[in-house]
Amino acid sequence: MNGYFRLIAAFALGVATVSGFAPFYLYPIPVVTLALLALLWRRSRTPGQAALTGFTFGMGLFGAGVTWLYVSLHDFGHMEPALAVLALIILCAYLALFPALTGWITAFRHFRASWAWPGMVAALWALAEWLRGTLFTGFPWLTVGYSQAPASPLAGFAPVIGVYGLSLLLMLSAAWLACWLENRQSHRFWLGLGSVWLIGFGLQQIHWTQPEGEPVTVSLLQGNIPQNMKWQPEHLAATMQIYAELVQESPSRLIVTPEISFPLFYEQAPQDYLALLAEHARSRQGDLLIGMAERSSSDNGYYNTMFSFGTSPEQSYRKYHLVPFGEYIPLKPVFGWIIDVLHIPLSDFSRGGLDQQPLDLAGQQVAVNICYEDVFGEEIIMQLPQASLLVNVSNDAWFGRSIGPRQHLQISQMRALETGRYMLRATNTGVTAIIDERGRVLEQLDMFTTAGLHSTAQGFGGATPYVRFGNSLVFALIGLLLLAGSLAAFSGRRKTL
């Protein structure tokens, strides 16, 4: 294949892979695009050519999939258009290094000639995605396993091996398909592919967790405060009035407002206003969660915090996993100038504790996570199995009308699948939704509307295998596949595919 055509094809495959994610949910597409990528790797003349192919695929995937970053940087961060485009290109180039590394390793002749090559590709791909989601605080957005939530048969594996396990099985399926495309005389690849997907379907029939107690009434509030107005002092009174009305119209025991609902510090909030809202929650024998910034009592730092008011004793949750360059500046001596460029309010938060306990609210044990935190499944499970409900609060107004909010919703669907718990999402502009323990969106509000979502949610007890073991199971699977691939490649018994 001509070198330029190869790169164009790889880029197009990366772009097409985005259709597997929300809002499109075309989960079979990534199987095909990854299979064709694997075929390009198998037909690469050198590992370097395979690495460039993987890099170009990554540029297509991330270039098309995280376009919302431009909206955040330019429309709301007021970064110059050229600088915002440059920042997007640099991020995509960094993220594309991980599929490039996978292609480079798997294209070595010893591995490519081995019968264990599909397993090697799958293991290395999953390992690369885990590294991408971990290094430099991690950016696991568009991990391909998310594309399978919630409808794909592979989603049945989510409560067992999590999103990285789904990535592994998705790439394994794709690699088997690539080998069949290369050698259509052999049908054993279909046996492996069909077996994995059939097992996934069977796992979907298992209920790993059990309902506990009666369903609780919930109200998830969506204030729809425009991002370009939220931090303007002259709009503070209107914002507080909107949420006061939404709270007082809520008939539920558990009422949740979005992340930093009020653009002020907790210490600055009018106490009579908070008392009024708390009294409404108590009148329903329930509790209210409000998002505000909180000053540290020990230093000059501040936290992104959710506070509870109502029947239960006052409690709080402080955000632990902060967004780099959005909520804190890494390596300040090097990158401190970015604060002046982005014009993002409160862009240097302090980190909350990692070992925070669920909040006891409205008769439920509630594991709160704020915005970006629900991208990290291994951190969400730290409050389980004690928690009976998951709550994510967010301000996805930063994404504008891009595909970002829908992608974030799908990430929450994966967390519900992994944990066997309802996920309640309260966001500023959308998508505010109730997701059941199977990852299905039961109810949601229209985006960019001011409203409350009033419904019920069922608390769950018990633990999925993923809650018990985290990523340990997928690491064990990665290790076994890499060991098998290495032994097959270097033992002198390299039976070709």
Curated annotation (Swiss-Prot):
Family per similarity comment: Belongs to the CN hydrolase family. Apolipoprotein N-acyltransferase subfamily.
Compartments in which it is found: Cell inner membrane
Enzyme Commission number(s): 2.3.1.269
Official protein name in the record: Apolipoprotein N-acyltransferase
GO molecular function, one term: N-acyltransferase activity
Topology relative to the membrane: Multi-pass membrane protein
Domain CN hydrolase per the UniProt entry, residue ranges: 221-461
Transmembrane regions: 21-41, 51-71, 85-105, 119-139, 157-177, 189-209, 472-492
Protein's job: Catalyzes the phospholipid dependent N-acylation of the N-terminal cysteine of apolipoprotein, the last step in lipoprotein maturation.
UniProt pathway: Protein modification; lipoprotein biosynthesis (N-acyl transfer)
Any single GO CC term annotated in Swiss-Prot or TrEMBL for this entry: plasma membrane
NCBIfam families, A to Z: lnt
Organism: Nitrosomonas europaea (strain ATCC 19718 / CIP 103999 / KCTC 2705 / NBRC 14298)
Keywords linked to the UniProt accession: Acyltransferase, Cell inner membrane, Cell membrane, Membrane, Transferase, Transmembrane, Transmembrane helix
Lineage: Bacteria, Pseudomonadati, Pseudomonadota, Betaproteobacteria, Nitrosomonadales
